[in-house]
């Protein structure tokens, strides 16, 4: 095939004409408006349109070509692609849309061609200039050496008003996601639920990488002049991780958590659109989709093999996760064997091995299931529902 080298001005003019024609074909412009933009008559506009349909982009530069390019995409396919994007996949990014074209519609076009078409037609914004090159941090060689936990506030379920928080636990060695769940708010309890689920399923891991949120680390300055000089204690999550021997590593910038930030960029550009296509509009259905469909897809598509096949996860060795992953509060028992906690008066039941617990210091545990228990050393003195009513042994087991 002959090679043509066109002047830059001719190429630039052809690109402008193509962009206007594509916008008119997509219905974003009337044909007479396209003619006005290009500064030509309606009759000339019709000629340009026919030349583009017959010769493709080359026809906009040189109409002396004798035959269409064998690689030219038919105009009907161009219209179908733009219609699909405009009417069904309008909120998809280019890569996601390109995959859907191939998987669901049998349209096999190159990613660059689809991207250029959508950008030229004004259906997607042109990409930003790439940031300066940075050296990637090496992955940890074993599963379980370093895990990330983070949450993203986003409109994950498009059919619901407002935002939802999505909590994710990710392995640095493989980019495998072990846990993902939509919650009304990321806080100490919802984060503990995520960590407990991973520990129960996988075992105890070595280190956890987090941001500087207040439920992970104490962000106040203990020696500030306007604050109490009392040393700042560990957060509930720091205490729980310490009991399991897990190191907490604090990230001081989003760039330090690059692997997690890239996951959010990918998920925000895909997951809401998948939920919309499936017609999912409830929290329960969305979380079911996450567990049964989305996580297997993510781990199959984006996870990588670790450098070493061994695992750094350690099996549980009798640790009481029910106590570890609970909120701990210290109280002193009153003379009536009651304690005050969260506007509740909790009565300690009679005990065979001690006459009274008056003046004793006990620990109150607020568990992840909403129940409350009172602990004295290794002993549980009583367990209560969220309203402070003492539970029977059968109710405790349930």
Annotated model-derived regions:
Residues 195, 199-229, 251-254:
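Acidic/histidine-rich, metal-coordinating catalytic segments
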Residues 1-10, 392-398:
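Intrinsically disordered, low-complexity and often Lys/Arg-enriched segments
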Residues 292-398:
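C-terminal, beta-rich DNA-binding module of retroviral/retroelements integrases
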Residues 20, 34, 45-48, 56, ...:
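Mobile genetic element proteins and their domesticated derivatives, centered on retroelements
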Residues 1-3, 11, 31-84:
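Short, basic alpha-helical/linker "hinge" immediately adjacent to a nucleic-acid-recognition surface
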Residues 76, 107-108, 119-177, 184-206, ...:
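Mobile-element integrase/transposase regions
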Residues 230, 236-308, 312-324:
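Charged alpha-helix within mobile-element recombinases
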Residues 56-155, 226-232, 311-321:
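Basic, flexible linker segments flanking DNA-binding modules
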């Amino acid at each position: 095939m002959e090679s043509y080298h066109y002047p830059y001005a001719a190429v630039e003019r052809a690109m402008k004409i193509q962009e206007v024609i594509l916008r008119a074909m997509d219905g974003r412009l009337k044909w007479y408006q396209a003619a006005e933009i290009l500064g030509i008559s309606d009759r000339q506009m019709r000629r340009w349109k026919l030349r583009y349909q017959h010769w493709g982009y080359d026809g906009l530069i040189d109409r002396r070509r004798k035959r269409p390019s064998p690689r030219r995409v038919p105009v009907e396919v161009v219209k179908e692609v733009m219609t699909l994007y405009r009417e069904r996949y309008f909120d998809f990014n280019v890569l996601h849309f390109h995959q859907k074209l191939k998987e669901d519609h049998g349209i096999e076009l190159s990613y660059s061609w689809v991207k250029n078409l959508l950008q030229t037609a004004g259906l997607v914004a042109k990409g930003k200039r790439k940031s300066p090159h940075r050296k990637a941090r090496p992955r940890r060689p074993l599963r379980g050496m370093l895990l990330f936990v983070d949450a993203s506030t986003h409109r994950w379920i498009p059919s619901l008003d407002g935002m939802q928080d999505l909590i994710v636990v990710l392995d640095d060695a493989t980019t495998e996601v072990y846990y993902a769940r939509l919650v009304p708010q990321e806080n100490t309890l919802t984060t503990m639920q995520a960590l407990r689920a991973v520990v129960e399923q996988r075992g105890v891991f070595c280190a956890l990488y987090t941001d500087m949120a207040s439920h992970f680390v104490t962000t106040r300055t203990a020696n500030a002049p306007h604050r109490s000089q009392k040393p700042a204690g560990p957060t509930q999550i720091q205490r729980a991780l310490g009991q399991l021997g897990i190191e907490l590593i604090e990230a001081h910038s989003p760039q330090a958590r690059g692997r997690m930030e890239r996951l959010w960029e990918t998920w925000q550009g895909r997951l809401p659109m998948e939920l919309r296509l499936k017609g999912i509009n409830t929290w329960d259905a969305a979380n079911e989709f996450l567990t049964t469909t989305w996580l297997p897809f993510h781990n199959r598509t984006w996870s990588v093999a670790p450098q070493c096949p061994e695992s750094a996860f350690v099996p549980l060795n009798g640790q009481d996760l029910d106590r570890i992953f609970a909120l701990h509060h210290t109280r002193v028992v009153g003379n009536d064997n009651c304690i005050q906690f969260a506007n509740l008066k909790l009565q300690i039941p009679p005990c065979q091995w001690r006459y009274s617990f008056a003046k004793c210091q006990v620990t109150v545990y607020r568990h992840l299931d909403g129940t409350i228990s009172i602990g004295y050393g290794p002993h549980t003195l009583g367990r209560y529902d969220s309203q402070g009513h003492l539970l029977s042994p059968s109710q405790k087991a349930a």
